[in-house]
Amino acid sequence: MASNEGVENRPFPYLTVDADLLSNLRQSAAEGLFHSFDLLVGKDAREAGIKFEVLLGVYTNAIQYVRFLETALAVSCVNTEFKDLSRMTDGKIQFRISVPTIAHGDGRRPSKQRTFIVVKNCHKHHISTEMELSMLDLEILHSIPETPVEYAEYVGAVKTVASALQFGVDALERGLINTVLSVKLRHAPPMFILQTLADPTFTERGFSKTVKSDLIAMFKRHLLEHSFFLDRAENMGSGFSQYVRSRLSEMVAAVSGESVLKGVSTYTTAKGGEPVGGVFIVTDNVLRQLLTFLGEEADNQIMGPSSYASFVVRGENLVTAVSYGRVMRTFEHFMARIVDSPEKAGSTKSDLPAVAAGVEDQPRVPISAAVIKLGNHAVAVESLQKMYNDTQSPYPLNRRMQYSYYFPVGLFMPNPKYTTSAAIKMLDNPTQQLPVEAWIVNKNNLLLAFNLQNALKVLCHPRLHTPAHTLNSLNAAPAPRDRRETYSLQHRRPNHMNVLVIVDEFYDNKYAAPVTDIALKCGLPTEDFLHPSNYDLLRLELHPLYDIYIGRDAGERARHRAVHRLMVGNLPTPLAPAAFQEARGQQFETATSLAHVVDQAVIETVQDTAYDTAYPAFFYVVEAMIHGFEEKFVMNVPLVSLCINTYWERAGRLAFVNSFSMIKFICRHLGNNAISKEAYSMYRKIYGELIALEQALMRLAGSDVVGDESVGQYVCALLDPNLLPPVAYTDIFTHLLTVSDRAPQIIIGNEVYADTLAAPQFIERVGNMDEMAAQFVALYGYRVNGDHDHDFRLHLGPYVDEGHADVLEKIFYYVFLPTCTNAHMCGLGVDFQHVAQTLAYNGPAFSHHFTRDEDILDNLENGTLRDLLEISDLRPTVGMIRDLSASFMTCPTFTRTVRVSVDNDVTQQLAPNPADKRTEQTVLVNGLVAFAFSERTRAVTQCLFHAIPFHMFYGDPRVAATMHQDVATFVMRNPQQRAVEAFNRPEQLFAEYREWHRSPMGKYAAECLPSLVSISGMTAMHIKMSPMAYIAQAKLKIHPGVAMTVVRTDEILSENILFSSRASTSMFIGTPNVSRREARVDAVTFEVHHEMASIDTGLSYSSTMTPARVAAITTDMGIHTQDFFSVFPAEAFGNQQVNDYIKAKVGAQRNGTLLRDPRTYLAGMTNVNGAPGLCHGQQATCEIIVTPVTADVAYFQKSNSPRGRAACVVSCENYNQEVAEGLIYDHSRPDAAYEYRSTVNPWASQLGSLGDIMYNSSYRQTAVPGLYSPCRAFFNKEELLRNNRGLYNMVNEYSQRLGGHPATSNTEVQFVVIAGTDVFLEQPCSFLQEAFPALSASSRALIDEFMSVKQTHAPIHYGHYIIEEVAPVRRILKFGNKVVF
């Protein structure tokens, strides 16, 4: 204590204060200061500065660090003065541990006593402060004041110097507190780790991979359930106090109460003298909440030492040992205790000198501190935040944490036949049961809808539409799979034009029946498709927009290639089932205001007609003779009317319903009561339905123009002029070459017609009968004598532009007819020469002895024509047959096939292989599409017609088998070929990987229930998977065909609690060292260095930390989506006008501004200007992962990897990168989290998949995503493996320290926080490779019900779902006066 006598008598009076050692050091320090003034002599400022160092040294020697002793933080320390600290170099202290044993009475051999020497590392800490003293003040101190003014200056100088010195001392005091707190944090693992690993239930089983898996599960459970427990308690209602006590008690129980200083208890409660078991270091807000929840003891003081003990090193080595819980300072002390007096009981009084000399003589004073009672423990609670706030320094217990959230958009529930809600009265209209948006709540309780419009900046970017990176990844991998496709990869050009020979040669003695991957996928349900046993197919399902296959390059090496799927309908059936396509069709109906013209009766009539085995074969003869010529139809109106009326009256079915041209002519020319009114009404409805569908498609596409082309061809394949109808009677090929800019090629046999200048070489124009009268003889001669097999000219009528008639025809053949008939049809080739002979070469047709009105059957001899008429149950007149025979005058000789190849549109031609940028189709020239034949019909017509299976919709094997015996034999040998999607068609006519329509569409057509919904569904299946299509569908809220997983990372400001048990750290305080840093003319600067050291004295982890409350959420938790046009500005489609249109529509390009900074071509990333203002905080960036619509909704209801497959492999045995990569990427192994499947999203979880190439930085040649990428941590392979390795090492390291008795483990193990723990605490999602479900619902009604404060709510309402938020942060949701926690 300083005495008043120590102050010199001066003329100016001085104020003296009480010397309180624990609260004020100024007076004791000033005593040395004032006595040292005599040492300063002379007037030279520099000399004075040198001499003042002596004064400063005397002053700093008086530093006692009493402020630290006043803090409750000192409860967890044994504080000792160690003047020889600077001489300590070894930095290790040894402790002796005896392991207790259990005596058994079952005859087991007694255990020997085991004693271990545990080494504790001593860590040095250096703190320093700087003090600057003015030379003018020092000179004034040297002067002798004589006047009152000089006295005042003298006193002011003394105060200034003393204040500067006190400033430095205060900084050192704070530095000690900060050092101790840092030491505590270094030894304080997170609560969710420590609580799990400290549980003997786990640790006593060892640490096999099974146990590690359990540990990770417990990590996640504790993280979710116990983080931010004060926020949970606020809204818990009754029981909150017990809940908070329980959480705090768990913290106390999780740490080790064992210490090598067992007998030391330097802090006790003022009332009762109960030892203080530890201290909670908290923030101010947490302190207020704790005291509000729990209250504090009546006596809010604790008793503690008023000074430091003294630590003296004696002997060559310092050995501190623990024996039977007693502390010993030296081996001599150990020998005296154990050998000389082994039965003498030790006490605190006798043990303390072993640690520090003079402890028993330390005075004890009361210290103000909050104390709470947890069970039988009294624990101090203190906040040190004010000290950090005063110094404008960050408080170590305030942390920034990042949590990743995810939610799905657009998932399809296959059988939404029920609801769990009794409150929602949503219209149960099926059109509303396919979700197209997700409703979420931002941090300010604003309800937001994330829909397709928000995702356009990702979905419309070229990176999503290119397979180049995917193919590079596959080709860089080891050898491709063993099974390689050989069938249907490429079209094979025939060297002749005889289609009958092509079909005969293909099916004759054909035994092999390969099935394409596309077809194999169609036959699998979603569960089987995603099963590990299906890895052979799954491994190439990497991109939603591309079918990937293995081809061969010029060197005959196997190379992966990709062809665009073009339309939504070509998505694999397991990932886009039929029910989903129909739901899209219903959305299409609603969005485009489609009012169907046909009714179910018309559809059923068409279906009955298609499956009528007695369908009159003579109708095909009539249709062949007319073959799309309106003039010939008018010539044969009586016969056509007879056919329609007879078939309608006899069977109630529609004739010629298989031909668009016939229906069109019937509607145009037979409306004058020539046929039955009911039948005509049905034809009109069919034609009206085509018009309605065409208008709906036009409303979907809009009226925009891109360049000189309508945007419709980019939106829907039916509006694309490059897709031709499957049957041609007029010269649509030359018209295509004229209007298309996509390099069309008309492949006729082995010739290519690609230039309209070559039209005379390939097209033989056939005009009206009057025009062709002069050529009848030449035509006859050609039919009889021509080399038809090698004549590559096509006999076609002139193309007639009738507005949108081409679109109507395509809708008929690609939508209406296959849907209503279940694609139960096949192409039909016609031998016109034999048909003409059948019709004309008979008596009534030639002879003038028969009048036109006579019934031809009454005068017809036995023959093919009679058989045809009889099985068709027709009785035409002689005149009708004559007119029909006359129609043959301009008929071709045979049906031919033409292969049409065109470039994909510019948004779909990003495949690297030129051949894969084109799409092909086969067009039947002067042929028909027909229904199945009966046995009787085939016997009669086998010389007239032959099967041509040329298209997915017009190649039903069951129908073809009724027309061709070789096909029937082939199908019988290979029963699996009965499926439309699997049926092998001649490669000269069909190559599935090049077709517009592929197996999924064929399977849908074959299996759908003919209905209005199916028609709408098939129409919607023709919508393209292109940026323009996504833009159009976003505008009308139509599902794009794929779902999305939205990933967002939010930042949380958390306030944490640190608990440290008593005497868990020994702090050694050395002596200060003063040095002059700088001496100037006007001032002198000194640095005071102080050396300290710390030793962790716990026998395990004696401190822990856990998040207590959320101070703030800094991000908005909104729907701001990553702009890929800013992230990857250098990538573009091949047409600048298309690029500009897309950017303008998605909002990535502002009109009237500089379109592109030239520097971005080098840097790879544009400067993104933020919003001018923010209302909800920093915008959290959302990123999109394209996901199959069949993804399991339950997957998103708990924390999982957004990739779709678990990526946390800490549970594996000896960690190595190969094993880790196998568990993460090898889909032949089950998902570790869901062993019944490999993945929930093959488009994101596999190496080289779309999600992988979008967010794995190894594929980014130019830049990483914008300012922040929430998906990068889940996809970047290097970062993912690094986090896995870090978590694996972390669990192993903690397990080493906590897996058994400390003494039996490595004696060099130190109980410190393992590297990476801070990252684990602040970014747990990166380590666990999981994102937390965010509150979202596919319908706002479900959110409203969730907010209705009911005990239960509706997780499912038909096709809609709600996903509750399961995250460490428990938000309070408030809409109006409704509150949900």
From Swiss-Prot:
Cellular compartment(s): Virion; Host nucleus
Primary location recorded for the protein, binned into one broad class: virion
Entry superkingdom: Viruses
Keywords on record: Capsid protein, Host nucleus, T=16 icosahedral capsid protein, Virion
GO cellular component terms, A-Z: host cell nucleus; T=16 icosahedral viral capsid
Chain coiled-coil ranges: none
InterPro entries linked to this entry: Herpes_MCP, Herpes_MCP_upper_sf
Molecular function GO terms recorded: structural molecule activity
Quaternary structure (record): Homomultimer. Makes the hexons and eleven out of twelve pentons. Interacts with triplex proteins 1/TRX1 and 2/TRX2; adjacent capsomers are linked together in groups of three by triplexes, heterotrimeric complexes composed of one molecule of TRX1 and two molecules of TRX2. Interacts with scaffold protein; this interaction allows efficient MCP transport to the host nucleus. Interacts with capsid vertex component 2/CVC2. Interacts with the small capsomere-interacting protein/SCP.
Role of this protein: Self-assembles to form an icosahedral capsid with a T=16 symmetry, about 200 nm in diameter, and consisting of 150 hexons and 12 pentons (total of 162 capsomers). Hexons form the edges and faces of the capsid and are each composed of six MCP molecules. In contrast, one penton is found at each of the 12 vertices. Eleven of the pentons are MCP pentamers, while the last vertex is occupied by the portal complex.
Family: Belongs to the herpesviridae major capsid protein family.
Protein name: Major capsid protein
Source organism of the structure: Epstein-Barr virus (strain AG876) (HHV-4)
Gene name in the database record: MCP
